[in-house]
Amino acid sequence: MFRITTLNVNGIRSATRKGLTQWLEQSKPDVVCLQEVKADECDIPAESRPHGMRAWYHCATRRGYAGTALLTAKRPREVRLGFGSKEFDAEGRYV
C-alpha cells in the first residue's frame, strides 16, 4: 500500500520536540506533506526528518511564517517549488 501523510505542524521545531519524527518512523509513510513549517531550511533540525527520507522545503521569505515541506521515501522524478507567482511564492506555500 502506498501511504501519504499530510500534516499542519504549526512549527516544525515544536512538532519535532513533541515526537513528530518518531511517529512518522512508526507509521512509515511513502510521502509526507507538511504545512506551516514556520522555519527557514537552515533552521530545521536534522532530527525532524525520518531516517531514509529525502526532504524539500519551500520556506517563506518572512521568518517564522508559513512554509511547506515534502518528504519522500523514494526520489521523485521532479520537485517544483512555487508556482510562478511573485505575490504568493514568497509565502512558501507550494512544493
Residue ranges and their predicted role:
Residues M1-P50, A60, Y65, L81:
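N-terminal, active-site-proximal structural segment of metallo-dependent hydrolase catalytic domains
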Residues K38, A46-V95:
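Structured beta-strand-rich core segments of catalytic domains in phosphoester-bond hydrolases
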